[in-house]
Regions:
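Ankyrin-repeat and related helical/solenoid repeat scaffolds used for protein-protein interactions
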Residues: 139-182
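Ankyrin-repeat boundary/"N-cap" motif
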Residues: 9-21, 42-58, 77-84, 105-116, ...
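Ankyrin repeat A-helix N-terminal signature
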Residues: 20-26, 54-64, 82-88, 116-122, ...
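Ankyrin repeat structural motif
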Residues: 26-34, 64-72, 88-96, 122-130, ...
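The conserved C-terminal loop/turn that links adjacent ankyrin repeats
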Residues: 39-42, 77, 101-102, 133-135, ...
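Ligand-binding grooves and catalytic loops that recognize ribose/phosphate and carbohydrate rings
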Residues: 107, 112-113, 119-128, 132
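Ankyrin-repeat-protein effector appendages
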Residues: 2-20, 69-82, 98, 131-132, ...
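N-terminal segments that cap or nucleate solenoid repeat domains
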Residues: 5-48, 87-105
Length: 199
């Protein structure tokens, strides 16, 4: 676990931004930056009014397990979105039992809980969260499941929540585009069976 120093020199916005960006999947950079400046661990970058994000929150919304696990080991807090992304069902249940309204909460950039849970590969967790009220973000949840090859989650979403198969992510790709780019023909065939087309 990182020992945060007593250094009182303020962190710069550039330091924080660089670390948070690294948190979106660049484990090597996260390790190096944190070794050089341990106070970055829970520092939040403000992207805009009301849109703040720490490195672990970045890891959670892109499904970067390695980065999230590393940051947790260094002492970052295990929040609901991260627990859902990692498939830590007992933690998710405990957090929701303590605050039932959190089922409607959103992570960084306003991304809904279901989208984080889709990365877990745990269809039962996704179904339970949806049943409990986490009904926003169905389409992005499918895209996230496809991005990590979480077939069981993709099947559940396709069968139960009618995601928009024409929706495109920030790269302009549909879920089918992502499956094809990954070389996941089984997933691509599943999506085509539900009417998906490439963009």
């Amino acid at each position: 676990m990182i020992d945060v120093t007593t250094d009182t020199t303020p962190l710069t916005g550039e330091q924080i931004r660089e670390f948070v960006i690294a948190g979106h999947g660049n484990l090597e950079a996260v390790r190096a930056l944190l070794a050089a400046e341990p106070r970055l661990l829970n520092a939040a970058n403000e992207w805009g009014p009301g849109d703040t994000e720490t490195a672990i929150q970045g890891a959670a919304h892109v499904g970067s397990r390695e980065v999230a696990e590393y940051l947790l080991a260094q002492g970052a807090p295990l929040e609901l979105m991260t627990a859902a992304m990692l498939g830590r069902r007992a933690v998710v249940e405990e957090l929701l039992a303590a605050d039932a309204a959190a089922i409607h909460s959103r992570g960084a950039h306003g991304i809904p809980l279901l989208c984080h849970a889709a990365f877990s590969g745990d269809a039962a967790l996704v179904a339970a969260l949806h049943e409990a009220g986490a009904c926003e973000g169905n389409t992005m949840a499918l895209a996230n499941a496809v991005a990590v090859g979480a077939r069981a989650v993709a099947v559940w979403l396709l069968e139960n929540v009618d995601p928009d198969l024409a929706w495109t992510n920030w790269q302009g790709r549909t879920a089918l585009d992502v499956a094809v780019a990954r070389g996941d023909e089984r997933m691509a065939d599943l999506l085509r069976a539900y009417g998906a087309e490439t963009s």
